[in-house]
């Protein structure tokens, strides 16, 4: 059900949960209706597969022919949302219906790929976003009678969350829990499946997860204090997630200092100074 964006978005509409306006794109004769009712700029996404920016196109009237005939019926069109930033939440539902949630995590994407995730319960709007996200994801898991870990990605627009996508599994944006929480998302998934007692999920300290993308392994990463390296052992390819580094510390200034040192050892430098907010 959730592997198909058509049935996933249909579920969100059925539950009356906020998401971007959308439609199933069946044939090229729909374009006039799409631009009128969905939006003047839309994001066309494959119904199945496609991730990290693959299988997605930003379409306006000027480039609608980029969607070739073989794609119709296999894609949906969503309104392009000029969001403020992106967040996600990872939670789990147990067999008895109980649920546990991690704090909402802030995410930075570059070229459609998650670069890093930041968790800090002192962020502005954190409390209101947490309430919204838990309610939305909880309704979805209850409707599906789901057992295990599920992630929900959202756009933030003002003080509202719009659901972007659901992932019925452990999630890249939840990797920070391996160092920043007493119970990781992997352990939480097992606890839910085995119906084991589980306390509330309290973060140890502010945390950042940095994805290692399209780069060879660098032993110097191990010199980063207050960190934990996870290397996947995959073949190195451009744009491929090959590992990640978690950094956790009570003082955000310390985290930023380590990130600034670390970014010079990565192929695509990212500025972390805005994390001071």
Can you describe what each PLM-predicted range is?
Residues 100, 150, 161-165:
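Protein kinase-like catalytic core scaffold
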Residues 131-152, 157, 168-215:
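Active-site "cap" helix and flanking loop/linker of ATP-utilizing ligase/carboxylase catalytic domains
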Residues 203-206, 210-237:
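Glycine-rich active-site loop/lid that clamps phosphate-bearing ligands
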Residues 238-249:
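An anion-binding loop in the catalytic cleft
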Residues 256-264:
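Short amphipathic alpha-helices in soluble, non-transmembrane regions
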Residues 59-61, 93, 212-214, 247-250:
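Short beta-strand-to-loop capping motifs
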Residues 273-277:
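Conserved small/polar residues in nucleotide/adenosyl-binding loops
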Residues 2-88, 92-140, 263:
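Active-site nucleotide/adenylate-binding loops and adjacent lid/helix of ATP-dependent enzymes
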């Amino acid at each position: 059900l959730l592997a198909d964006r058509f049935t996933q978005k249909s579920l969100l509409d059925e539950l009356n949960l906020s998401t971007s306006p959308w439609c199933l794109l069946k044939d090229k004769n729909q374009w006039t209706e799409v631009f009128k009712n969905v939006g003047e700029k839309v994001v066309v996404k494959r119904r199945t597969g496609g991730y990290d920016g693959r299988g997605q196109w930003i379409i306006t009237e000027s480039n609608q022919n980029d969607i070739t005939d073989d794609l119709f019926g296999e894609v949906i069109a969503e309104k392009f949302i000029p969001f403020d930033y992106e967040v996600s939440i990872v939670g789990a539902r147990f067999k008895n219906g109980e649920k546990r949630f991690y704090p909402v995590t802030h995410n930075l994407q570059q070229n459609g790929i998650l670069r890093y995730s930041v968790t800090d319960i002192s962020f502005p709007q954190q409390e209101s976003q947490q309430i919204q996200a838990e309610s939305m994801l909880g309704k979805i898991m209850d409707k599906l009678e789901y057992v295990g870990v599920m992630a929900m990605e959202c756009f933030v627009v003002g003080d509202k969350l719009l659901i972007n996508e659901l992932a019925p599994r452990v999630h890249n944006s939840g990797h920070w829990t391996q160092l920043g929480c007493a119970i990781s998302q992997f352990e939480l998934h097992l606890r839910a499946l085995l119906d084991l007692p589980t306390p509330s999920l309290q973060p140890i300290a502010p945390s950042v997860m940095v994805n290692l993308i399209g780069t060879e392994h660098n032993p110097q990463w191990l010199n980063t204090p207050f960190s934990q390296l996870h290397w996947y052992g995959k073949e190195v390819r451009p744009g491929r997630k090959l590992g990640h580094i978690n950094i956790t510390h009570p003082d955000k200034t310390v985290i930023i200092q380590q990130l600034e040192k670390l970014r010079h050892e990565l192929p695509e430098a990212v500025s972390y100074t805005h994390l001071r907010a």
